[in-house]
């Protein structure tokens, strides 16, 4: 089995968890940023894992556009600041499933936490939260808590995801 991990990363969170996934996968594998998608023949891969950061409760635009070009057996790894048990995370997970299932044989996905970009954190200090992001009363708490992610807890989620889908 040959697996491609292809990711879009704004802050480095998604790149980091995708690199962990790459370490954990047994067998033939390749990892590249989506920007390098034209350097590979996607038809050579049995499995494609798309790494994305969450933007407006879905894959970011670059990853979304790429997923819409696929018709393969795919998986996703997503990173977001919100707690993984939050309603927002559940909505994101379901939106990613819908996106990945449109034209593909979607198999499985996993979300991990990641820190908020410094640029967005700065915007939050200059403008009312509801102008930039849907108003969430505890947004500052979420941002501060997310700052320690991705961490070992997130990497364990990735390891479990890889072991379940690729190494069993």
What residue spans do the PLM features occupy?
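FMN-binding flavodoxin-like domain, especially the glycine-rich phosphate-binding loop
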Residues: 24-30, 45-50, 55-168
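Short, surface-exposed connector motifs at secondary-structure boundaries
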Residues: 1-2, 46
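Flexible, glycine-rich phosphate/dinucleotide-binding loops
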Residues: 12, 38-40, 83, 118
């Amino acid at each position: 089995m040959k697996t491609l991990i292809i990711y879009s990363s704004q802050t480095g969170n998604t790149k980091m968890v995708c690199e962990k996934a790459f370490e954990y996968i047994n067998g033939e594998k390749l990892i590249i940023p989506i920007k390098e998608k034209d350097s590979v023949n996607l038809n050579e891969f049995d499995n494609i894992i798309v790494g994305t950061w969450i933007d407006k409760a879905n894959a970011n635009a670059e990853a979304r556009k790429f997923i819409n070009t696929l018709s393969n057996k795919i998986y996703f790894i997503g990173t977001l600041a919100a707690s993984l048990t939050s309603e927002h995370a559940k909505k994101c997970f379901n939106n990613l499933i819908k996106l990945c299932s449109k034209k593909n044989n979607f198999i499985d996905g996993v979300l991990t936490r990641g820190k908020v970009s410094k640029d967005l954190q700065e915007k939050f200090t200059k403008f009312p939260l509801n102008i930039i992001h849907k108003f969430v009363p505890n947004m500052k708490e979420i941002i501060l808590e997310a700052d320690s992610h991705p961490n070992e807890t997130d990497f364990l989620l990735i390891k479990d995801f890889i072991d379940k889908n690729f190494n069993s």
